[in-house]
Amino acid sequence: MKRRIGIMGGTFDPPHMAHLLIAENSRAAFSLDEVLFIPAADPPHKQDRAVTLYAHRYHMTELSIAANDAFTLSDIERKRSGLSYSLVTVRELQKLYRAGADFYFITGMDSINDLHKWYHPKELLASCHFIGVTRLGDPVNTIALEKDFGKLACERIYFLEVPGMEISSTDIRRRVREGLPIRYLVPDAVKEYIRKEGLYLDKGDKRNAFSG
């Protein structure tokens, strides 16, 4: 029987509680045997802003998932050159697992709605399932997806409501810069790592990053 593997790709700059909620709810709802967290080495959709060093993002993700045995960290995108396209990553995972796994790409509805802009999206959708995570009560419009992907949209894209989706990495970085607390937004180990390394502060700002 094939294993069911979830893929949590992202910049994780930083990883936060919503990432963990999404991964765990997806694992439970779709009976996933494992969820792979894959920090993007060179994300194609983040070319317009500076991204924190991969080593920091990788280590923060490692700290975030340490308490869950079903979560695994992968550096598969660091090991290759070029932009971190999801299709290339999925194909590499298929080679690693051979024919022994079905993959479920976990992402937010904003990304699902922009799926037609991704690198070779039809090939990607044919290669793995997608779990589109929505906020509680948010409507799901499948008309555009069916227009772009036809039958594949019905067969390959699933939807899952998850609470706590209001947390964002962008807001956490802002809060650190402004000296506001980020406790309960990120795991304690990640909070301490950000403080220790002085991440997300303006250049030359050596003050304590946040109050807790």
Predicted regions and their residues:
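Nucleotidyltransferase catalytic core that binds NTPs
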Residues: M1-G212
